[in-house]
Amino acid sequence: MTSPSQVPLPPREPLSDDERIARARAFADELGNRRSVRDFSPRPVPREVIEACLRAAGTAPSGAHQQPWRFVAIADPEVKRRIRAAAEAEEREFYQHRAPAEWLAALAALGTDADKPFLEVAPWLIAVFYERFGVDAEGHKHKRYYPHESVGIATGLLIAALHRAGLATLTHTPSPMGFLNEVLGRPRNEMPYLLLVVGHPADDCRVPAIERLPLEAYASFLE
């Protein structure tokens, strides 16, 4: 077995424990203001912001370092219109026929329905895909390891980066999402993971009155 090629770890800024604690708390506090938004402003967002946030997403760890994420950033109004039409068709079917009563009850508190105007109003949509398998230049298939987990981590970094840039987001998951491959011309080895709506919140934006779990409800320490 050959030894992997290695390079020195890039240097990091030295910090005291107090500085680390302060940074960690400030970051947690900033993310504490993050909310999913459904009322967006059409105000433009420079492509450079989206590019930088996608670069951050691309730093995520991945199974066997295969980096199975694929992102399609969409600002074209006609493409957004087609996505909205297809998504709303699936959502109407979901709300009227496929969704179990328990799921609909859980969604009721969020005020969601089959109408998705934000898919056209928001300046950017980012379609997130994961590779089910890789395909080399000769057309041979190659297994992807932990693609769901890898793309989930990358998407979390993307959402955090967009929030840090002062933007609002919404994770949208119409079911099924196969129409995204057709509308966006993606190959069959890529599966839609979610659709991220990105932009500035509308001036009159309101969000559901919900509370997050306290730390002790979801984390434990063994010291």
Residue ranges and their predicted role:
Residues M1-V37, S41-A52, E93, H97:
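N-terminal accessory segments that position/regulate proteins before the catalytic core
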Residues Q67-V151:
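Glycine/small-residue-rich phosphate/adenosyl-binding loop
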Residues A56-G58, A109-A114, L180-E182, C205:
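Glycine-rich, charged/polar anion/phosphate-binding loops
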Residues L31, C53-A57, L196:
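Short alpha-helical scaffolding segments that buttress acidic/His motifs in well-ordered protein cores
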Residues L180-Y193:
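Short, electropositive alpha-helical surface patch
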Residues R55-A57, I126, R132-V183:
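Small-aliphatic-rich amphipathic alpha-helix that forms the alpha element of a beta-alpha
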Residues T2-R23, D113, M191-E223:
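C-terminal helix-cap and adjacent tail motif
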Residues G58-H65:
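Glycine-rich phosphate/pyrophosphate-binding beta-alpha loops
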